[in-house]
Amino acid sequence: MAKIGLIDYGMGNIHSVTKALESLEEEIILIKNNHQIKDCKALILPGVGSFDPAINNLSKTELIIDIKNWIKSGKSFLGICLGLQLLFESSDEGTINGLGIVKGQIKKIPQLSDQRIPHVGWCELLPTRKNSLLKVDELNNWVYFVHSYHAVPSNNNLITANVSYGSEKLTAMIERDNLMACQFHPEKSGKTGEKLLRRWIKSIQ
């Protein structure tokens, strides 16, 4: 059993993520300052809400440098929903710079005549390449989304799965070495979400 640090900065779906991980019999530490990180084997950055308030709240915890150093050192890290978006350089939603850990931008989901924004509901993951959480030919994995913005990484090779949005494809998951992140909510995605969390936990270094 690995100690998993769940970053608590006032913008997260803390309760539901904690409950999901505890159901997998994992030990969770709520991280509110950098002194609590040292005992963790992996970190999760969850998030629900808007980009600028999230960056401001994260800044108040004084954890930003620690998060960057954590990822740079090769330790396991998972971003969830807004937690994925904060990893990027900027967002159409706000004016404050993101963490810049992943090159690219967060863009407003395009308005399509046959689709609604926010993009809410169950959608099938479409794997794009080999990765730690999904096999390339693994289909019928439905997960739950709630978002109005989507990630556009500068390097498309970071994308490990997309989701269909009308005629468009939106980024659903990214992976780079020890860093993984998903736009959907695995903690609200039933058996598929549980499976993906188990695989992430198994990958913890």
Swiss-Prot record:
Catalysis: reaction(s): 5-[(5-phospho-1-deoxy-D-ribulos-1-ylimino)methylamino]-1-(5-phospho-beta-D-ribosyl)imidazole-4-carboxamide + L-glutamine = D-erythro-1-(imidazol-4-yl)glycerol 3-phosphate + 5-amino-1-(5-phospho-beta-D-ribosyl)imidazole-4-carboxamide + L-glutamate + H(+); L-glutamine + H2O = L-glutamate + NH4(+)
Single annotated GO MF: glutaminase activity
Localization per Swiss-Prot or TrEMBL: Cytoplasm
Record-annotated active site: 81, 185, 187
UniProt domain Glutamine amidotransferase type-1: residue ranges: 3-205
Record-listed E.C. numbers: 4.3.2.10, 3.5.1.2
Keywords, ordered alphabetically: Amino-acid biosynthesis, Cytoplasm, Glutamine amidotransferase, Histidine biosynthesis, Hydrolase, Lyase
Alphabetical GO biological process terms: L-histidine biosynthetic process
Pathway: Amino-acid biosynthesis; L-histidine biosynthesis; L-histidine from 5-phospho-alpha-D-ribose 1-diphosphate: step 5/9
Pfam family, one: GATase
CC per GO annotation: cytoplasm
Function description: IGPS catalyzes the conversion of PRFAR and glutamine to IGP, AICAR and glutamate. The HisH subunit catalyzes the hydrolysis of glutamine to glutamate and ammonia as part of the synthesis of IGP and AICAR. The resulting ammonia molecule is channeled to the active site of HisF.
Quaternary data: Heterodimer of HisH and HisF.
Name assigned to this protein: Imidazole glycerol phosphate synthase subunit HisH
Gene giving rise to this polypeptide: hisH
